[in-house]
Amino acid sequence: MVKYMVLKIKDNIYCMSFIEWKIKEYRGLDIEKGTTYNSYLILDKNNVIIDTTRIKYFDELLSYLKDVANLKLDYIISNHISPDHNECIEKLIELTEAKIVTTKIRKYYLDAQFNTKDWEFVIVKNGDELNIGNRTLKFITDDKCEYMLTYCVEDKILFSNDLFSQHVVYKEKIDSDIGHKIMLDAKEYFANILLPYRKSILKILNILKDLDLEYICPSHGVIWHIMIDEILTKYRMWCSDSYKNTAVIVYATIYSSTEKIAKALGEGLSEEGVDVIYHRLDTSPLNIIMRDILDAKYVLVGSPTINMNVHPKVGMLLTYIEGLKPSNKKIGVAFGSYGWKECATKKIIEAFKRLGFKIVDDKILTFRFAPKENDIKKIKEFGRKLAKINV
């Protein structure tokens, strides 16, 4: 299989996209479509590489730099300190003696990863610029955000690191060749990786609105060109905790009892015009569930009681959601079934309280063994009433 692709973005500006075809997991996420690690090369009086890649691709990276730049490298810009963007830095410095351009806080983390005693650093702050010959690079950063962004003023290109990324491999590298399906990939990435940093990202978005942008070049996935305004608008929405009239119903079930409650709730909600998305935990990966929860108004979680607790997959879900700290502008509903003693919904409600959700509770949503026909009618009615409640 092809290990990397090269795309010429503009004269003397290239994307080296290193392809991880068979990756199944990234930071605990299920990765179904692979991912890429994008490194960017600018050839000028001073040659610059913006972020590197995983060490297993070093030979390919080195070969390309020899071919197009004769291994002349003056600056390595480190927008992010995680290994998928930095593992090749040490070897590149040994071969080129390039200077590292980064922020004070990111230097601290590079010092923790490498022996940097002999490295030459250029420490930059938000708004600082670096002239590399015919081009000026401007740096955008917020120390509460994991990522620094680099803007090429003359070419109107934003190198955004993880912002605007997607975990996906397409044979095409530009959004114009793919279409709007890329938006779902970008939403999934935001919901599962960037969501805890949304307040800092919103500050960065306020800076970006004053920039003239022709390309946004992220560290993973596809480059943005014709859909820049749309992805910026989406990011602003996701960062501002706005929501749609959507209900995400997530559940685990053993003997279909909890599933019957889930379906009845969904029918009641949909009858009142709410868009309903079902996720059964034995078939839906957490990252897709979180993508849908991101801008949903209602989050309904169901579990049978097992060993005086929630189903293990529900426990994993709740822990995962809490770690990502979604908006508290949501209505939370717990439901479930039990045999001896009901415990699951209490655990779910405790998690909702920690998340700050508005909780709507009703005894009609818990059943010993399974709901009967008359119970199903009551559950649907609860769903219809739920659709009229405001956050």
Swiss-Prot record:
One of its GO terms (molecular function) is electron transfer activity. This is Uncharacterized protein MJ0534. InterPro entries: Flavodoxin/NO_synth, Flavoprotein-like_sf, Metallo-B-lactamas, ODP_dom, RibonucZ/Hydroxyglut_hydro, Rubredoxin-O_OxRdtase. CDD domains: flavodiiron_proteins_MBL-fold. Disulfide bonds: none annotated. Residues 247-387 form the Flavodoxin-like domain. It comes from Methanocaldococcus jannaschii (strain ATCC 43067 / DSM 2661 / JAL-1 / JCM 10045 / NBRC 100440) (Methanococcus jannaschii).
